[in-house]
Swiss-Prot record:
Source organism of this protein record: Spermophilus atricapillus
Sites where the protein binds a ubiquinone: 201
Classification via InterPro entries: Cyt_b/b6_C, Cyt_b/b6_C_sf, Cyt_b/b6_N, Cytb/b6-like_sf, Cytochrome_b, Cytochrome_b_C_euk/bac, Cytochrome_b_N_euk/bac, Di-haem_cyt_TM
Record-linked CDD domains: cytochrome_b_C, Cytochrome_b_N
SUPFAM superfamilies: a domain/subunit of cytochrome bc1 complex (Ubiquinol-cytochrome c reductase) (SSF81648), Transmembrane di-heme cytochromes (SSF81342)
Molecular functions per Gene Ontology: metal ion binding; ubiquinol-cytochrome-c reductase activity
Binding site for heme b b562: 83, 182
Protein name: Cytochrome b
Gene Ontology CC, one term: respiratory chain complex III
Length: 379
């Protein structure tokens, strides 16, 4: 009798995706982050669902409802902090996942890569709208500043901003629609994840060497299921240490003050995972220029398959490219630090230099170094 998992229409899909999937035998821990992102998404949807049962998307009661969740709901404080810090873990995994793709040349699977970039944009939009919901000071002013950036779009800018706000300022209508979008987007993300996996399974996974691994494949289960479970346990351990020992470590104290349109916080800044983009935005004195730089900082990832000039796919055997890659990582960490600093000397100039370096490394230095390495191969 044939095994049910190989014949049943639904089980067959699961089998081909997670059980009998032929996988390269040498993929390292850097390939764990895909499954960890799946875990993060599941945790966020579940905790978010339970939070939505008690939250009220109204300017008068939103802040109080979050307080009520933390004080009166059974384990409400735990659900709230798992959700808030789960977002941070989500972005850590996302950045490492994208970094892995950049280092090992996974972007040459360009359908998978492009869907991944769309996913990155949608996750960032979801996180931004989620940050507005507690209706604290940073929620309100963050929403005001970021939505206001759209007014830089020529001709339709101001109309567009008022259309998104649902009035002449960030108010009840804005909060209600942000809650609606924040609720629906994770399910759209789930659908996009399926598309992402569909494209990935068309080609099979890349591996650290960047070489074709068809001659050396092993089944996903049990080898990588066990490996993914280890990664999941470590992720949960780190998340729970964060949640139970210092839940507010990555948050902003200003968000414990209810939103007040009449008093601006001294330093408006987003959550830590947006600081690099915020620093790039602030480094350009012109409003429209800043917005374009902000969008370009993520869209630039789309150019990677076009700028890949090396004869080798992975950076595993390319020491000069490795050096440039780690310079890019250091630059992004610098931008993250600058994004959280006030707009004054010397932070302004450091931010501008780091922003220029970010675009230069990706658009000029990495392709140039690839060509040099190609020449060195002929020695």
């Amino acid at each position: 009798m044939t095994n049910i998992r190989k014949t049943h229409p639904l089980m067959k899909i699961v089998n081909h995706s997670f059980i009998d999937l032929p996988t390269p035998s040498n993929i390292s821990t850097w390939w764990n982050f895909g499954s960890l992102l799946g875990l993060c998404l599941t945790v966020q949807i579940l905790t978010g669902l339970f939070l939505a049962m008690h939250y009220t998307p109204d300017t008068m009661t939103a802040f109080s409802s979050v307080t009520h969740i933390c004080r009166d709901v059974n384990f409400g404080w735990l659900i709230r902090y798992i959700h808030a810090n789960g977002a941070s873990m989500f972005f850590i995994c996302l950045f490492l996942h994208v970094g892995r793709g950049l280092y090992y040349g996974s972007y040459t699977y360009f359908e998978t890569w492009n869907v991944g970039i769309i996913l990155l944009f949608v996750v960032m939009a979801t996180a931004f709208m989620g940050y507005v919901l507690p209706w604290g000071q940073m929620s309100f002013w963050g929403a005001t500043v970021i939505t206001n950036l759209l007014s830089a779009i020529p001709y339709i800018g101001n109309t567009l901003v008022e259309w998104i706000w649902g009035g002449f300022s960030v108010d009840k209508a804005t909060l209600t629609r942000f809650f609606a979008f924040h609720f629906i987007l994770p399910f759209i993300i789930t659908a996009l994840v399926m598309v992402h996996l569909l494209f990935l399974h068309e080609t099979g996974s890349n591996n650290p060497s960047g070489l074709i691994s068809d001659s050396d494949k092993i089944p996903f289960h049990p080898y990588y299921t066990i490996k993914d479970i280890l990664g999941a346990l470590l992720l949960i351990l780190i998340l729970m240490i964060l949640v139970l020992f210092s839940p507010d470590l990555l948050g902003d104290p200003d968000n414990y003050t209810p939103a007040n349109p009449l008093s601006t916080p001294p330093h408006i800044k987003p959550e830590w995972y947006f600081l690099f983009a915020y620093a790039i935005l602030r480094s350009i004195p012109n409003k429209l220029g800043g917005v374009l730089a902000l969008v370009s900082s993520i869209l630039i990832l789309l150019t990677l398959p076009l700028l890949h000039l090396s004869k080798q796919r992975s950076m595993m055997f390319r020491p000069l490219s490795q050096l440039m890659f780690w310079l890019l990582v250091a630059d992004l960490l610098t931008l993250t630090w600058i994004g959280g600093q006030p707009v004054e000397y010397p932070f302004i100039i450091i931010g501008q230099l780091a922003s220029i370096l970010y675009f230069t490394i990706i658009l000029l230095i990495l392709p140039a170094v690839s060509l040099i390495e190609n020449k060195l191969l002929k020695w």
